[in-house]
């Protein structure tokens, strides 16, 4: 039976798009639920400045609360030098900072300038410095992000050759992994297959690649299947398919440095963790995940957030917000 690793990023990518703060006790409930369901790779938050990402204003406290569980790997986002310094400091303080996602690069320079106010060469130089700092600080695995591989909301379709060039440069710098990202849902399954086939031809170790697709146009699961056929074995998802760019409002207060959202609020998030796990189980893949338990957790997240999310598994099981509205004991 072939193995596929599902990495859950609900607590980071998922929550960063939410416009209301989630208390630590609810985050811990989600974290423990993911672990109990068998999820081994969990992205738990960001070391960004709390002025810009107030959802993670207590990330240091949360990091120290993380339970040490054999086989579970915790990932943190650290996109600039200050955030990297915080990650290293928390590692030194005893927090389980196992893996750090840094070096965020978009093949679209227009996107990079708008999102990060940097040129490509600025970002490559920063990535070079940060991977060195993290490895020297005792972080075992450092992952870079390559985004807008297939297209971006500013420039449109992007040539795949640019992404291969970026991948080469980042591996040469010493990154352990690359997160191949489609933040805009621009990929169709055929282009995803083309890209992943070349990625695996150039760098055939599947442990060095993770795919991160936002399911904006409803093709996320099809793209993940196309990638699996080419040998990709690690995929990022969120419970209920939540997530997206950082919220521009937090509990009624405008967040500093934000502008308009790139997309309408209809669909912004990733492939649903519970849907993907359910599908892989039916296809005969070994994920190590208890799909029923994960679906119950997805329903619990709907109740926490007070709305129905994009999960077919939760809807089919009848365990989510729509059912809880009529069951006071579930809330």
What are these model-derived regions, one by one?
Residues 1-331:
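Catalytic cores and adjacent flexible loops of soluble metabolic enzymes
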């Amino acid at each position: 039976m072939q193995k596929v690793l599902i990495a859950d990023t609900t607590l980071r990518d998922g929550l960063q798009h939410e416009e209301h703060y989630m208390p630590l006790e609810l985050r811990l409930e989600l974290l423990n639920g993911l672990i109990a369901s068998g999820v081994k790779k969990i992205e738990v938050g960001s070391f960004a400045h709390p002025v810009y990402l107030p959802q993670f204003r207590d990330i240091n406290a949360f990091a120290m609360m993380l339970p040490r569980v054999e086989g579970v790997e915790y990932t943190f986002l650290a996109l600039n030098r200050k955030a990297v310094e915080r990650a290293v400091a928390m590692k030194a303080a005893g927090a389980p900072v196992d893996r750090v996602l840094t070096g965020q690069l978009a093949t679209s320079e227009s996107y990079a300038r708008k999102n990060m106010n940097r040129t490509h060469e600025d970002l490559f130089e920063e990535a070079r410095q940060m991977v060195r700092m993290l490895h020297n600080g005792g972080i075992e695995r450092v992952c870079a992000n390559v985004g807008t591989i297939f297209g971006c909301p500013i420039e449109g379709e992007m040539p795949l050759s640019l992404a291969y060039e970026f991948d080469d440069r980042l591996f040469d710098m010493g990154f352990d992994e690359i997160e191949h990202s489609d933040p805009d849902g621009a990929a169709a399954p055929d282009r995803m297959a083309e890209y992943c086939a070349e990625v695996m031809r150039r760098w055939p170790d599947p442990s060095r690649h993770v795919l991160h697709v936002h399911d904006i146009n409803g093709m996320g699961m099809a793209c993940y299947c196309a990638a699996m056929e080419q040998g990709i074995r690690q995929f990022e998802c969120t419970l209920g398919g939540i997530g997206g760019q950082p919220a521009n409002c937090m509990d009624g207060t405008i967040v500093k440095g934000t502008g308009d959202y790139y997309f309408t609020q209809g669909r912004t998030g990733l492939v649903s963790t519970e849907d993907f796990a359910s599908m892989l189980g039916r296809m005969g893949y070994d994920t190590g995940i208890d799909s029923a338990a994960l679906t119950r957790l997805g329903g619990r997240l709907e109740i926490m957030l007070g709305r129905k999310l994009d999960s077919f598994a939760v809807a089919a099981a009848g365990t989510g917000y729509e059912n809880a509205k009529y069951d006071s004991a579930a809330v």
